[in-house]
A protein has these predicted regions:
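Juxtamembrane/disordered regions of integral membrane proteins
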Residues: 2-152
Length: 152
């Protein structure tokens, strides 16, 4: 059995992947992500108000999706270096689990506490919002990563 070379990524356990993803997310563009989340939530709330009804939980959920999608995608597209960032760029779909799961947890809490959803409805809402963030983050890493490799 040969030892992996320095350029080769050793396989990480699921727990180690979450730790590395958390480390990479610490370098996320949080101000930009927060602004995107606020704009999306405000726009969604304005559209609902124009339609004649107040839908705060829906607007907040849309804002959470924008917040975590921009944070996750921005993390992968930033030019920061480090082992965690290198791992995240090389494994964008595995990295995307972190922002997707975080969005799902926040949306679940919002929909159960503020919204009219019960536990089952809140879980369904959380899963599909998390899936959207997962897809957008993974796509940003895949497309942005391939463009960076092609340009280099």
């Amino acid at each position: 059995m040969s030892a992996p070379t320095r350029n080769e990524d050793p396989e990480l356990s699921r727990r180690e992947e979450l730790t590395v993803s958390s480390s990479a997310m610490s370098g996320a563009p949080w101000k930009t992500a927060g602004a995107a989340g606020a704009i999306v939530a405000g726009g969604d709330l304005a559209l609902h108000l124009a339609g004649g009804h107040l839908a705060v939980p829906t607007a907040l959920s849309a804002g959470v999706v924008a917040l975590f999608a921009v944070a996750g995608g921005g993390t992968l597209l930033r030019s920061q270096s480090g082992r965690a960032m290198r791992w995240a760029r090389n494994h964008p779909w595995r990295f995307a689990l972190m922002p997707g799961a975080a969005a799902a947890v926040v949306v679940f809490v919002l929909s159960v506490l503020i919204g009219s959803s019960g536990l089952i409805g809140g879980a369904f809402t959380a899963v599909w919002h998390g899936a959207v963030v997962y897809g957008l983050t993974g796509l940003a890493g895949t497309v942005g990563g391939s463009r960076k490799r092609r340009d280099a």
